[in-house]
Amino acid sequence: MPASTLLLPLQLFLAAGWMRAGIEKVIEPDWWSGTALEAFLSAQDGQMLPLFVPFVDYVVAPWTVGVAWFVMIAQLAVAVCLGLGRFLRPALWTGVLLNVTFVMSGRVDPSAFYLVMEMALLFALARPTSRRFAMRRATLWSLAAAPFVPFVTTLHPAEVIHDPAMMMITLCWIAAITTIVRSIDRERLGPLAVPLWQAPTDAAEPPPVPHGRGQTFDRGAQRY
């Protein structure tokens, strides 16, 4: 069974989740005025990752109305694209951008789980790569986790799920490991590692078949 079919429940779940979040904001007047976003930022004060605070202060806070509109439209657009199965890569990367923003602002749940599902779909859509290229990507994912290490506040099993820095590190590690494993599967399976929806559909033209003395039969033209 193609991976696209096996992962369809994740795609539909994400579509429903983003649609719910978008509609929730559309019917809330305070989101249109930016007041709800200002209240959200105030509530998250002290919980944001320190490296994210300058972005909020100098980019989000002065443009709360525009950012609020962007979030509403982006959430609805992601939901529609995932629900219809169109523009999946742009939709998933937009979802990743939104969820990473929410996690770095201190709101880990449910964004961390959305990120895992979005990454699973993106890896399913990606073409297999060589092990050397996969190692480079895995290294980049590992380096992306490094800036969050100083901001880990707890390793307690009951609290670590609420630590935005630890969640970002975990997601980067998951991406790095998955990248390497996919490259190993490609080398082990060869052509079978290519998803069915990415396999070439145009078969090679068969060579002419000899037909009689000094003549050939052209299969494409159906003539002698």
Residue ranges of each PLM-predicted region?
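Extended, low-polarity transmembrane helix blocks
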Residues: 1-51, 58-74, 84-224
